[in-house]
UniProtKB/Swiss-Prot annotation:
Membership in a protein family: Belongs to the NRARP family.
Gene Ontology BP annotations: Notch signaling pathway
SMART domains from the UniProt entry: ANK (SM00248)
PROSITE patterns given in the database record: ANK_REP_REGION, ANK_REPEAT
Subunit composition and interactions: Forms a ternary complex with the intracellular domain (ICD) of notch1 and rbpj/suh.
Task performed by this protein: Promotes loss of intracellular domain (ICD) of Notch1 in embryos. By down-regulating ICD levels, could function as a negative feedback regulator of Notch signaling that attenuates ICD-mediated transcription. Involved in angiogenesis. May be involved in somitogenesis.
Pfam families: Ank_2
Annotated protein name in UniProt: Notch-regulated ankyrin repeat-containing protein
Alphabetized SUPFAM superfamilies for the sequence: Ankyrin repeat
Gene from which the chain derives: nrarp
Record InterPro entries: Ankyrin_rpt (IPR002110), Ankyrin_rpt-contain_sf (IPR036770), PP1_Regulatory_Subunit (IPR051226)
ANK repeats: 50-79, 83-112
Key words of the record: ANK repeat, Developmental protein, Notch signaling pathway, Repeat, Transcription, Transcription regulation
């Protein structure tokens, strides 16, 4: 692993950069970051200070493109936030019908492939 890759894998730094890209809704930056972290021990399902994962935050923001990207890189759609709400609960409550449909489709597909 190169020095640049090791600095990218620095967990506290990486977590901050990751959360900031999610907050900004910056899909290109997040995709680049996730692709560069494939060799890292980085958990896309880690919780931020608000008790949300990046997926939960993207659903709250109504950002379907970011939701799809996070799921592609392993975000767990069944994981609950600190209030016990899954991404699907948050999407339904927020009126994000496109995200609701996407999450239902992903849940149906993943449960049928078991």
């Amino acid at each position: 692993m190169s020095q640049a890759e090791m600095s990218t894998c620095s967990t506290p730094h990486t977590q901050r950069v990751f959360q900031e890209a999610v907050r900004k809704g910056n899909t290109k930056e997040l995709q680049s970051l996730l692709q560069n972290m494939t060799n890292c021990e980085f958990n896309v399902n880690s919780f931020g200070p608000e008790g949300q994962t990046a997926l939960h935050q993207s659903v709250i923001d109504g950002n379907l493109e970011l939701v799809k990207l996070l799921v592609k890189f392993g975000a767990d759609i069944r994981l609950a936030n600190r209030d016990g709400w899954s991404a699907l609960h948050i999407a339904a409550y927020g009126g994000h019908q496109d995200i609701v449909l996407y999450l239902i489709t992903k849940a149906k597909y993943s449960s049928s492939s078991r």
